[in-house]
């Protein structure tokens, strides 16, 4: 009798080639499956994630599910996995799940965070965990623009090439920015019902250009209309992006 588990994982994405298994690459999915295979004495156990994170993207709350060949208490699964995982990955929560739970298809929303270091020079201790924008920024302009980010829109201009999803309409419930004076960082957060490929990184890059005065405060309204990726142009680095939380019914 197999038991389905819902597991929440945190990881430093710097040294992973993304979430999804790739031949001869170190990936989050592959690392989890390797640990589970060892636990199950060689039986292959497939891991399903809430979504793929790219190389260099971090997670505080990536959710996965898998079917294990025997039932262990949830806390025992957490301890066993953590004893086998590398130092840049940790299981932060483990729960027994119903058979109809699916880490990807049961989601109703996600929350992402993006950190931007505003220092004049690249900080060697932050470069793996933040984006870097060494230009003048008016945070009030960004806050004004965020009101246009929220709502239901066609985000075609903010979807990178390579995505396979045709429907580009998404709803952003919350979009915020906070200036952390102690760290000289901007902290963006976005909560939506779903996100397109590289969407958060493109949104952040566009907001930074608005904050710098390179774009009109309400340029998002124009970008929704033109539906042209080339009009948004820039993509913020993967290093500043964190999958913070995945929401379920």
UniProtKB/Swiss-Prot annotation:
Entry annotated with the keyword Nucleus: no
Protein residues bound to substrate: 112
Any Gene Ontology biological process: tRNA pseudouridine synthesis
InterPro entries per the UniProt record, alphabetical: PsdUridine_synth_cat_dom_sf, PsdUridine_synth_TruA, PsdUridine_synth_TruA_a/b_dom, PsdUridine_synth_TruA_C, TruA/RsuA/RluB/E/F_N
Pfam family, one: PseudoU_synth_1
GO MF, any single term: RNA binding
Catalyzed reactions per annotation: uridine(38/39/40) in tRNA = pseudouridine(38/39/40) in tRNA
Active-site residues (renumbered): 54
Enzyme Commission number(s) from the entry: 5.4.99.12
SUPFAM superfamilies tied to this protein: Pseudouridine synthase
Principal EC category: isomerase
Keywords: Isomerase, tRNA processing
Homology family: Belongs to the tRNA pseudouridine synthase TruA family.
Function summary: Formation of pseudouridine at positions 38, 39 and 40 in the anticodon stem and loop of transfer RNAs.
Assembly with partners or alone: Homodimer.
Name of protein: tRNA pseudouridine synthase A
Native source organism of the sequence: Latilactobacillus sakei subsp. sakei (strain 23K)
Gene expressing this chain: truA
């Amino acid at each position: 009798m197999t038991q389905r588990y819902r597991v929440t994982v945190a990881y430093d994405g710097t040294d992973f080639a993304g979430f999804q298994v790739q031949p001869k690459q170190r990936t989050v999915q592959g690392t989890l499956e390797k640990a589970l295979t060892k636990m199950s004495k060689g039986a292959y156990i497939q891991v399903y994630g809430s979504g793929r994170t790219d190389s260099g993207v971090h997670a505080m709350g990536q959710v996965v599910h898998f079917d294990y060949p025997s039932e262990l208490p949830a806390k025992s699964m957490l301890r066993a996995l953590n004893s086998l995982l590398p130092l840049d990955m940790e299981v932060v929560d483990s729960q027994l799940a119903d058979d109809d739970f699916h880490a990807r298809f049961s989601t109703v929303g996600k929350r992402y965070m993006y950190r931007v270091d505003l220092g004049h020079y690249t900080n060697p201790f932050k470069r793996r965990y933040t984006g870097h924008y060494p230009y003048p920024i008016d945070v009030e302009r960004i806050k004004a623009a965020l009101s246009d980010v929220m709502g239901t829109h066609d985000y075609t201009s903010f979807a990178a090439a390579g995505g396979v999803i045709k429907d580009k309409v998404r709803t952003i419930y919350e979009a915020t920015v906070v200036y952390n004076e102690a760290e000289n960082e901007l902290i963006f957060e976005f909560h939506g019902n779903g996100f397109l490929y590289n969407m958060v990184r493109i949104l952040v890059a566009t907001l930074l250009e608005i904050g710098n005065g390179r774009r009109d405060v309400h340029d998002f309204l124009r970008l929704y209309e033109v539906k042209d990726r080339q009009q948004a142009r820039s993509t913020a680095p993967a290093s500043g992006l964190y999958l913070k939380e995945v929401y379920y019914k």
